[in-house]
A protein has these predicted regions:
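Structural beta-alpha unit
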Residues: 2-8, 80-113
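Short, structured coil segments at secondary-structure junctions
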Residues: 34-35, 84, 132, 140-141
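General small-molecule cofactor/ligand-binding pocket signal
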Residues: 40-42, 89-93, 145
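A short acidic, glycine-rich active-site loop
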Residues: 59-74
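Short, flexible loop segments at boundaries between secondary-structure elements
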Residues: 137-148
Length: 148
């Protein structure tokens, strides 16, 4: 087998961030892979989750979304301070995570998407429909880097 080496440096990279250990690793990897290009860290406030919380009578969907947006803003502030050696853009949007990740990746015309992967679970919805990472892998127009 040959020692084929291909150097592909993305010019624009989208990092899907849910603030888990895996997504933080994905951001680290993106910063290393794309030293000169545009990096956008995206957090999607899951409106389906907010609707489920409302359906259980815990809180209004709009209240949940507001709190999740606020928390994401705080988390991004920490990340930006922590990674101050390499600036990057941040976005917080509302919607279904995999749909928004794909849409924004196309809108920004990125060369690659990086995201963390959670360990396999036995949740019925993931068994039937797949995880967010799997859905992004299937629907993406560009390479997807999944980081455990």
């Amino acid at each position: 087998m040959s020692d084929l080496k291909i150097d592909i440096v993305p010019k624009a990279l989208l990092v899907a961030v849910d603030f888990s250990v895996g997504s933080r690793r994905a951001l680290e990897m993106a910063l290393a892979l794309c030293p000169q290009g545009e990096i956008t860290a995206l957090h999607v406030v899951d409106t389906e989750f907010a609707a489920r919380v409302e359906a259980q009578g815990v809180a209004a969907s709009s209240e949940v979304v507001g709190k999740l947006r606020s928390r994401a803003g705080e988390e991004f502030s920490w990340l930006l301070q922590e990674k101050s050696h390499r600036p990057f853009d941040t976005m917080i949007v509302e919607g279904i995570p995999f749909v928004e990740i794909i849409k924004i990746a196309k809108d920004l015309d990125v060369d690659m998407i990086a995201m963390g992967m959670h360990k396999a679970t036995f949740r019925v919805d993931e068994i039937l429909f797949g995880s967010t990472a799997e859905k992004v892998l299937r629907a993406s127009h560009c390479p997807v880097l999944c980081v455990p």
